[in-house]
Amino acid sequence: MQQAWFDVKFKEAAQLRVGKFKTPFSHAYLTTLGETLFPQLPTSLTTAVIMPYTLNAVTPNIGTGFDLGVELHGLVKDKFGYEIGLFNGTGAAVNTASKTMSDDWHIPSLLYAGRFTYMPYGVMPSTQGNPNRLNEKKMLIGVSGSINVESENESTNDTRVGFEWALLYHKWYFAAEAYWMNVGFTKRQKINEHYNYVGGYIQGGYFVAPRVQLAARYDIMNRNSTTKDGLLNMPAVGVNYFFKGCNLKLQAMYQYTGRTGHANQLDRDNDNLGLATHSATVQLQYAF
């Protein structure tokens, strides 16, 4: 089960959501699944980072995605939004509450997350391009953060911070995000070190015809942490066709995974393990 949740609306500024849903982190993730610019999310959000230890149970990525939890959220004056929640911290693959207490911090081993947004022109729709919204003028500026206590099978405490910006202006759509993750090991791992990872992307789309949208993205990440030289840079291009009279969309994209700045060939080879140098995706998607 990927998602199942309900909302209780006390008023516009105070709403309670309970179930399995998207955690409050990243414009890319929080966009409605059928409304994304590309069929694949930015690699810098979804790929597992690399550590200088062989720990099969420790494979975090910067994005937090879907999770079980409870969240208080609301909208103030149609301009200010907030989301504050507690989550299981185990991601989309787990459907039961499985966390206990932190041995190190003596607090519940949960994902503590929050997001705050400012939308100067009114509520930003959850879309990255829609042929029925070609006269919009909306902008979103947001900041989010989280601490996942005893994540990765009780092996690490992970801190994440993100900044996001998005703009819908008539036929144009633009977005940019930057994010940082700090991974610190729990005492039982006997590793007294912290590792920092940063990533980000910029992307844009334009409707060249009423139902045809062109897309471009540049994605970047230091997958092997700031302790080593080297970056992944991942440009992508795409095209979207929206069928008339239904919520059906045909998407196609191509992405290249490049590597630059590594100290040696071994680091360069390791940095894109599990990632295709050239990838193409075609997807027919129904939004509901």
Predicted features and spans:
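A short secondary-structure junction signal
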Residues: 30, 83-85, 93-101, 126-128, ...
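Short, contiguous, pocket-lining structural segments
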Residues: 64, 85, 104-108, 153-157, ...
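Short, well-ordered amphipathic alpha-helices
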Residues: 112-125, 237-240, 283-285
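Outer membrane beta-barrel
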Residues: 1-92, 108-123, 133-134, 198, ...
